[in-house]
Amino acid sequence: MKLKRHLLTAALTLFCLSAANAQLLRTTVEQGEIEGVEHEGFALYKGIPYAEAPVGNLRWKAPVSKKPWKGVFKADKWGDRPPQPIDPNQNGGEQGMSEDCLYLSVETPAKSKNDKLPVFVMIHGGAFLSGSYSGTQESFVKEGIIYCSIEYRLGALGFMAHPELSKESGKNISGNYGILDQVMALKWIHDNIAAFGGDPDKITIAGESAGGISVSILCASPLVKGLFRGAISESGRSFWPVGESRNGNTAMLTSKAAEAGGLLLQKRLKAKNLKQLRKVPAMDIVKNTAFESFWPNVDGYSITDDQYKLYEKGSYNDVNVIIGTNSDEGSMFSRPVSVSDYERRIHEIYGSWADQVLSLYPAKTEEETYFAQSDIFRDGSFAWGTYAWANLQSKTGKGKVYMYYFDQDSENTIVKSRKGGASHVAEMPFIYGYKFGSGKMTETEQHMEQIMSRYWINFTKTGNPNGDSLPFWTSYQEGKPTVMIMKEGLHLGPVQNQKQMDFFEKFFKEKRK
């Protein structure tokens, strides 16, 4: 009897060891040995530091590569999220919050370092103000894709420019630290993903909202040339003209305009110089900037120029892309006002173009001002940039553009569209399985979820969303019905709201003069 128990115990032990060995739970990266944890049958590496903590004298500096560690690094806890005014409530509330925030995660189904699996790198959104890496994505991993997600500095700590910082940099640049974090994280993934069974030549970067803008910026940045083969930008683009003000979300800031914002913050914090600024507690900076917009600026280094102009002359990372917007993007950012206030605001932003705007987006009642503002925000801040991206790359590049327009009215959303349609981030449950609102989906929506997630998975694997008897998605061609309209009965159609796109094309062209 004892012998039987002994043999059974030995067999169970051997089985457990074999199961553990089936996952790549320990590997070696540039900094040393690293050990992950088992999660849903896969190997999950939480909180991998890809750079030194940007604290003390490293605050407001380009990220510094992580030094080698001694022993085995236990990647079993999420790294802290960046200081921010909103709790993103990611990863089950397991994360702390501090300036020591430059971490990434890797979830891999690989059984061996030689598997050479495709890689999906997610850049979170949140207006460059809030958010946190999303940690795990079993729906992709179970399909043989390695899923990575990254943290980067946010708000003033990630994007404040300042004349002293520009002088200190040696390159006469400042701000854009959050973008430089993304660059370093992507380089780390590219250089180390083989240790997790990934193929560095099969990396797809993706993001939504500010994450999508980040993807757009990276697609034009020389700093990441050759580090990815595909890109997905959901509701994000960076094709505005370069200007001195972001009034009405109509411009990317010049470095000088961004530096002026840093000087104003210094004055508000009553700091005499940069040395004193670096000693201000991080959360005091967050509280004093609250929901102010510290965004990327055109510094001539990570963001080299007006992105529209870069794409006109073919100066960008020419890869296949999936890009798109939702039908009611602006509903999350709009509120009803009086008709007179609406018209006054339009004149303030658009000047001599105001009458054309009011003709395209009329409002006779307070309720109609909500819908008009929502549509202006959708088109000027989201849809036009996607339209410009598709047109320019299809003319000057070899990489194919797969453009979509998401228009499904669902209960599974953060903000319910008041006019029917899809609000900001409403596409994400259909791709990544997130649960928002009621979390409920109709049978038709569940079918859509299967199709949309499969498009994203196929694209990550091959660079083409098609296959598996899916509705065929033709690459974009200007003037032809090659936009995938994503709602009940997915189908190809023309660019939506073409008159509005034509207006913003002319408006932004004039602003570039």
Predicted region positions:
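Bacterial Sec-dependent N-terminal signal peptides
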Residues: 1-24
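Non-catalytic accessory segments of hydrolases
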Residues: 22-176, 200, 434, 439-452, ...
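A structural signal for well-ordered alpha-helical segments within the folded catalytic domains
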Residues: 43, 99-102, 180-187, 213, ...
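Serine-hydrolase-like catalytic core of hydrolytic proteins
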Residues: 90-271, 301, 310-334
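Surface-exposed helix-capping loop/turn segments at secondary-structure junctions
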Residues: 108-116, 193-202, 269-275, 392-402, ...
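Short, solvent-exposed turn/loop segments enriched in Gly/Ser/Thr/Pro and often Arg
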Residues: 153-155, 206-210, 404-410, 471-478
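Substrate-gating cap/lid region and adjacent catalytic-acid/histidine neighborhood
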Residues: 243, 272-446, 455, 462
